[in-house]
A protein has these predicted regions:
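Acidic (Asp/Glu-rich) sequence patches and key acidic residues
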Residues: 1-117
Length: 117
């Protein structure tokens, strides 16, 4: 499972969010261009999530919900892409959506193709 969080104006609906996410993903994550460092709000969101669960690269007790690491490596510019283990995806995605919302960031579930509240 994955969850996407980005900085910017909230899209009007789920379809707009899906298009916006695709554009951001292609521009910042799935590109041959040099990596763009994450903007401060995205870095802060990742840091807040890592306060609750360890980065996969530091997880000695198999308690991390992340399926790749380092987690900040999934961020570029105004976007972060959170790959999660299925066994912890429900809890981790709910918490990540809550953290993102508290920081004024957008959150999108690409599996359901829906904005998260």
């Amino acid at each position: 499972m994955t969850l996407l969080v980005w900085e910017g104006k909230r899209p009007a609906d789920d379809a707009s969010a899906a298009r916006y996410f695709t554009d951001l993903y292609d521009r910042y994550i799935d590109t041959e261009e040099p990596a763009v460092p994450p903007v401060e709000p995205i870095a802060a969101c990742v840091a807040a999530l890592l306060e609750r669960w360890p980065d996969l690269t530091e997880d000695e007790g198999d308690s991390s919900p992340w399926s790749t690491g380092p987690l900040i490596g999934e961020a570029g510019g105004p976007l972060v892409y959170f790959p999660m283990r299925w066994s912890m995806a429900e809890e981790a995605s709910a918490y990540a959506a809550e953290v993102a919302a508290s920081m004024g960031l957008n959150c999108f579930d690409p599996q359901a193709r829906k904005l998260r509240p």
